[in-house]
């Protein structure tokens, strides 16, 4: 009899083992379903983390750009501009002044002939003292002229040209135009009109490898920027649309014609007022 009980227990244990062994494949069959469900939930989580990281990175870069640009414009309210992106680009392109390299000598506005700002305003931006950086009337006129099939002409103000010359690259694009508008707003807000004109006349390209009023006066006319005559100032400004093609040292007939036109326009332009007589900007 005890032997029979033992055999029954043995058979029962075998049956239990068999049942458990039969049940294990089912549990193993269910595990892939749980793994698949887990992976399907982690994928959106990973994507969310990646997108969050990218968003934070973009916002950080934008904030960094805003801080650096504000500090740069604020510093240039007083600090002379000795180098511009265009100077570096021209150097890489091999455009050099006589004797190699570039010629650039910063001088304060008081050391520049008073006729040069007048000539620049007459030729480039006759509403310079009135607008806030953008001449909307000139922009509209240029747009309407282009729509009517006329020649495409620029409507950039002296403020816009200064922003481009000091902070940006020369090649035109919608991206650069956007940055140009941003920097134009900043310099009009932080700088006086006199400071904008001072930076403009000291940084603008006036010949191959020649930048600024003092450099062009010494290189082409053998005098200081203060000693430039009225007609010489008009001739220098006449080259500004394309100073690599037009030369104030060897002017063509077209250049002489443009010089005379600028001198006529200068009669209606007053001298740039002293900064003390204008409202100070922050």
Model feature map: region roles:
Residues 2-282:
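Juxtamembrane regions of bacterial inner-membrane/periplasmic proteins
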